[in-house]
């Protein structure tokens, strides 16, 4: 049985296919992506609190949203990086998902609005991820209990950022105890059985993903750089344990 939210999303995308194609302006794709999120949004989820905050990173300010579930007793804070093929998505497109995950896990969430391509190409999003993890670890009492542990979570392109952030900070004693990677793309050069089988007609299109990678990398040619392709890392010693979540009919499935 297909979940009602998934059925609604598939129906909406079929009726509004512009979101899938780079021939549309980035502004139009972002608007359509938000419309998809609103179309599939479930019933409102009651929270103890939902608060918009600003993270003062070096040379820039990032927007973030802090979620505290009802009956909060969590000893962990989940730092969440949304999906959107490096180019689209924001706090609003993934707001309901964060509420649902926070409520289900009984954990506090901090969702990050990192900078997007093409306005801010590689390595802007990666730098935002790494600097965010450092800032949150150094200011943990602002977001969670002082002895809370950190979990880094990302879906799709946010999964790439989560994986890279966890790897790049693995020796910095940030108390990151786990990384959860949902449908993460692991590099622009990867070709798999699932990308061949599901790369067209299953919402996420191979051609669109390649186009978004081009915008994101903006001419950067070293695809063996582990910040681009996390699987190319030579040494992951001390990296937090990872949970990989994949979907059957997803071109990115085998990258997990």
For the regions a language model picked out, list residue spans one by one.
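A glycine/proline-hinged amphipathic helix-loop "lid/cap" segment
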Residues: 1-69
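Short beta-strand element of the alpha/beta-hydrolase
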Residues: 74-84
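Active-site glycine-rich loops that stabilize anionic/oxyanionic intermediates
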Residues: 82-88, 249
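Short amphipathic alpha-helix adjacent to the substrate-entry channel of hydrolases
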Residues: 92-112
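Alpha/beta-hydrolase fold nucleophile elbow
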Residues: 143-156
């Amino acid at each position: 049985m297909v979940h009602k939210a998934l059925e609604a999303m598939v129906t909406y995308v079929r009726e509004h296919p512009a979101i899938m194609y780079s021939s549309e302006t980035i502004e139009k794709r972002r608007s359509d992506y938000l419309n998809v999120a609103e179309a599939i949004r479930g019933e409102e989820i009651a929270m103890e609190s939902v608060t918009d905050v600003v993270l003062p990173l070096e040379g820039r300010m990032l927007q973030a949203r802090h979620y505290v579930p009802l009956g909060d007793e969590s000893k962990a804070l989940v730092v969440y990086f949304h999906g959107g093929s490096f180019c689209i998505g924001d706090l609003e497109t993934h707001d309901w998902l964060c509420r649902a995950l926070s409520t289900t896990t009984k954990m506090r969430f901090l969702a990050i609005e990192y900078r997007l391509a093409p306005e801010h190409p590689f390595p802007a999003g990666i730098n935002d991820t790494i600097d965010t993890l450092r800032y949150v670890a150094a200011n943990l009492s602002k977001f969670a209990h002082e002895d809370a542990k950190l979990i880094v979570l990302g879906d799709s392109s946010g999964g790439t950022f989560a994986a890279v952030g966890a790897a790049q900070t693995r020796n910095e004693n940030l108390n990151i105890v786990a990384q959860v990677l949902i449908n993460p793309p692991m590099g622009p050069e990867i070709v798999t059985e699932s990308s061949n089988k599901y790369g067209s007609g299953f919402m996420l299109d191979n051609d669109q993903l390649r186009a978004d990678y081009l915008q994101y990398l903006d001419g950067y040619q070293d695809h063996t750089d582990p910040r681009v392709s996390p699987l190319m890392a030579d040494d992951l010693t001390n990296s937090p344990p990872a949970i990989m979540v994949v979907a059957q009919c997803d071109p990115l499935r085998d990258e997990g």
